[in-house]
Design a protein with these regions (language model features):
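Core catalytic lobe of class I
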Residues: 1-126
Length: 126
């Protein structure tokens, strides 16, 4: 298994075509103060999906964490291959600074894309 922790656009050109079984990512949401947080910029999704077509096997699952409104934006970048969302219930809520103005956030979405059905091992739990 190879695990990369880097800018994907620096890594993708060096990956062998059709060699990826699972692409797990946590994209920048683009929801923070854009003047101070250079790392939270929305990526070029056309470029991302182009590379995915090259490096991923047809039954590769592309999985990303997200939260609204970014979840909707992410799904819209590849509606054709979007399959479903799961909900990650966090053990600790976030958003304490706005707790007097809105509910704290206790979950994130897990967004799943693929072209062909990947291996799926149901856990049969509720």
């Amino acid at each position: 298994m190879n695990l990369y922790h880097n800018d994907m656009f620096d890594v993708f050109p060096n990956i062998e075509p059709q060699s990826i079984d699972l692409l797990l990512t946590d994209f920048p949401y683009g929801t923070l103060n854009k003047r101070r947080n250079e790392w939270d910029k929305i990526i070029d999704y056309d470029r991302f999906w182009h590379y995915v077509d090259i490096i991923c096997k047809p039954n590769c699952a592309i999985v990303s964490t997200a939260s609204q409104p970014f979840t909707s934006v992410l799904i819209s970048t590849n509606y054709t291959n979007f399959k479903y969302c799961l909900v990650w219930e966090k053990s600790k809520s976030t958003g304490y600074l706005n707790a007097k103005k809105q509910p704290m956030r206790s979950h994130e979405d897990i967004v799943v894309f693929y072209k062909k059905q990947p291996t799926y091992n149901p856990q049969m739990t509720v």
